[in-house]
């Protein structure tokens, strides 16, 4: 096409001609009908598409993930509007890899294709991060679900609300915990997650150990430590292990249990009448055959809903700052146009929501212009910035003892549908020696670590080899101190203006070292403290696990087990030196990450600095970024408190990318909460906030 202002695209099926602007999409087809004179226009108009397949919606939702599936369901139920939901993937409702809880672990995979859904492009976008200099240049793939349910379709379905504190302290007005708790309750009753009631000796031993540590921390008088919960006072918030004990609820309605230890997580799994289990996730909760037929058309009172699968969204079409349509590409590579009457809601996740906005002309004008985006709508360099995630430093522990005793101690650790591999363990606060704990941590209990226990060796294969740890060993288990207030921020940028299937550029640098300058030491320490925050957190997480294991050695013996526990990854000797160094150097222990600046040339000082240096290797190679990405289009930066994209009339973002701060644990409950809140914001009435808890979607397993 030569005319840069306005061209004609001729539809070969209908023999009609429609305006088409090359300032929007570079796309053309043969012209079987006569050219019609065209007056130049600066306004983008409909691209070439098959008019037989044209759709028009009042609300067009982009992405059927945790938020988008819920949003489409309830908008269709509580309004007479025409709702169109576009999803790049499939439904997978009859795919046992998705629906069977054990399918997650490869039950149905061919032996030579034993990959998880998160590693399989049939189920997820394979978003490789740009080289991470803080992790030796690694480029990890961070899973992003592609199909009905989004990432809820491919993950372990650990449902965690996150506690009151993160919302009351890190989220803006209108999004405090009391504002959102009913929406969390809505998600919980809709999913109806299960808890594993299988007793595991190791879990009971660990809970008894954590209770002892909590009692010691309370007695110490320290204002902050990892098992202190201000909301429960001088009572350890640790589940008891007596036969009549009541399980503690990490997802309590009032959000009191920001710090709590428990025997089992909540898993998005339901038991069927025949005794079998099915994974319960956003897709089969809100879009099942009770509500949407096999052709994607809504049923009964959901007849206003249309779900289009295999629809990769290219961009939103604007007239001025008002969205008038959405372009998507079907599985055959044909471009389609959906007309928008009221508004567009983007629910494509933390990676793809900002990329759709950027391709649509919302973002940093300087950068977007440089890569060829022509139709610039609103200049906001913050779109795609502020990306946050959780990070999981992993430890491996060996159980020593007679084989029969080790087997007895580790019994009931196997993955099953109700635990999905996790055997508890705790939501923890800040370590007392973390220099980066919030200023009000003396009065408010923050959730900092999610402690999880699972069987086997949970580190990458190359680390197993280098450490001499065999995955077939039957005397090893994994403890993970997931850093759920991980300090680094990343950002996302599109690489091209017109290839929606391209993975965007994902920049996230994890563990940065601090290089001293010539400035006085007292001026450098505040900068070093923030720069080293990720490493500080990781090593303190190791110390928390070490303290737990040392206490477990005692409680295991008290429970009649003739075993002993030794951390083997990281090496026990290094963790022992770290623990002793924390006691020796106190609040300034972390200064020894920068030995030239601390100026301690004593043998003990040099050894501790060397210990920190060696331990820094482990979180860089034996840990991973979770698939908990969010905050890349957050409230106050890209969207306002009503989730409307700043600078537009009628576009919202209603997924985890809009989060003001990462939730305290696994993220899909928070993504769903945002979608639920968006229903009421769009409809202008608290339908979901006030919906009775017994009014829930009905599961259809056919």
Curated annotation (Swiss-Prot):
InterPro entries: FAD/NAD-bd_sf (IPR036188), GMC_OxRdtase (IPR012132), GMC_OxRdtase_N (IPR000172), GMC_OxRtase_C (IPR007867). SUPFAM superfamilies: FAD/NAD(P)-binding domain (SSF51905). Its EC number is 1.-.-.-. Its cofactor is FAD. One of its GO terms (molecular function) is identical protein binding. FAD binds at residues 58-88. The active site is at 628. It is found in: Virion; Host membrane. This is Putative GMC-type oxidoreductase R135. It comes from Acanthamoeba polyphaga mimivirus. The lineage of its organism: Viruses, Varidnaviria, Bamfordvirae, Nucleocytoviricota, Megaviricetes.
């Amino acid at each position: 096409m030569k005319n840069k202002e306005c061209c004609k695209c001729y539809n070969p099926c209908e023999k009609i001609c429609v305006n088409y602007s090359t300032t929007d999409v570079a796309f053309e087809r043969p012209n079987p009908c006569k050219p019609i004179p065209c007056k130049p226009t600066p306004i983008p108009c409909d691209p070439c598409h098959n008019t037989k397949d044209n759709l028009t919606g009042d609300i067009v939702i982009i992405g059927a993930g945790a938020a988008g599936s819920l949003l489409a369901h309830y908008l269709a139920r509580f309004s007479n509007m025409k709702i169109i939901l576009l999803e790049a993937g499939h439904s997978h409702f009859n795919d046992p890899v998705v629906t069977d809880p054990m399918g997650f672990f490869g039950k149905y995979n061919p032996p030579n294709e034993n990959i998880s859904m998160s590693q399989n492009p049939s189920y997820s976008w394979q978003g490789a991060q740009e080289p991470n200099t803080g992790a030796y240049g690694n480029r990890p793939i961070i899973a992003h679900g592609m199909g009905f349910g989004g990432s809820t379709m491919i993950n372990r379905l650990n449902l965690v609300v996150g506690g009151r504190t993160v919302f009351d302290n890190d989220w803006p007005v209108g999004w405090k915990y009391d504002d959102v708790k009913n929406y969390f309750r809505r998600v919980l009753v809709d999913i109806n997650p299960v808890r594993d009631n299988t007793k595991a000796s190791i879990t009971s031993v660990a809970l008894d150990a954590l209770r002892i540590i909590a009692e010691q921390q309370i007695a110490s008088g320290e204002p902050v430590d990892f098992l202190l919960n201000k909301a429960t006072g001088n009572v350890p918030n640790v589940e008891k292990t007596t036969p009549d004990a009541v399980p503690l609820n990490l997802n309590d309605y009032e959000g009191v249990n920001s710090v709590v230890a428990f025997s089992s997580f909540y898993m998005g799994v339901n038991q069927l009448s025949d005794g079998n289990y099915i994974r319960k996730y956003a897709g089969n909760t809100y879009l099942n055959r009770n509500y949407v037929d096999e052709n994607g058309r809504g049923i009964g009172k959901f007849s206003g809903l249309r779900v289009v699968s295999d629809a990769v969204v290219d961009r939103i079409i604007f007239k001025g700052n008002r969205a008038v349509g959405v372009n998507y590409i079907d599985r055959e590579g044909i471009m389609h146009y959906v007309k928008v009457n009221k508004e567009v809601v983007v629910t494509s996740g933390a990676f793809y929501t900002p990329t759709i906005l950027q391709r649509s002309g919302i973002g940093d004008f300087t950068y977007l212009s440089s890569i060829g985006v022509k139709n610039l709508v609103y200049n906001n360099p913050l779109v795609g910035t502020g990306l946050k995630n959780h990070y999981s430093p992993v430890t491996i522990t060996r159980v020593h003892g007679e084989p029969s005793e080790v087997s007895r101690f580790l019994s009931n650790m196997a993955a099953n549908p109700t635990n999905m591999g996790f055997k508890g363990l705790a939501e923890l606060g800040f370590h007392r020696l973390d220099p980066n704990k919030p200023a009000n941590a003396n009065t408010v209990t923050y959730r900092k670590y999610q402690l999880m226990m699972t069987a086997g060796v949970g580190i990458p294969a190359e680390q197993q080899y280098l450490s001499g740890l065999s995955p077939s060993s039957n005397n090893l288990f994994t403890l993970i101190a997931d850093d759920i207030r991980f300090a680094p921020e990343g950002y996302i940028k599109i690489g091209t203006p017109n290839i929606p299937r391209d993975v965007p550029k994902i920049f996230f640098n994890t563990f940065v070292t601090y290089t001293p300058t010539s400035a006085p030491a007292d001026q450098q320490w505040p900068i070093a403290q923030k720069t080293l925050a990720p490493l500080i957190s990781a090593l303190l997480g190791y110390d928390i696990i070490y303290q737990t294991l040392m206490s477990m050695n005692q409680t295991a013996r008290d429970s009649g087990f003739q075993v002993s526990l030794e951390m083997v990854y990281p090496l026990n000797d290094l963790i022992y030196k770290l623990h002793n160094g924390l006691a020796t150097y106190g609040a300034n222990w972390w200064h020894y990450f920068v030995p030239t600046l601390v100026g301690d040339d004593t043998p003990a000082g040099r050894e501790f600095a060397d210990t920190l240096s060696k331990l820094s290797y482990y979180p860089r190679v034996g840990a991973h970024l979770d698939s908990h990405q969010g905050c890349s289009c957050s409230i106050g930066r890209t969207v306002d408190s009503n989730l409307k994209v700043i600078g537009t009339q009628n576009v919202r973002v209603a997924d985890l990318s809009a989060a003001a701060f990462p939730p305290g644990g696994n993220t899909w409950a928070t993504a769903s909460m945002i979608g639920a809140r968006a229903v009421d914001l769009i409809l202008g009435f608290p339908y979901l906030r006030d919906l009775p808890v017994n009014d829930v979607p009905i599961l259809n397993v056919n």
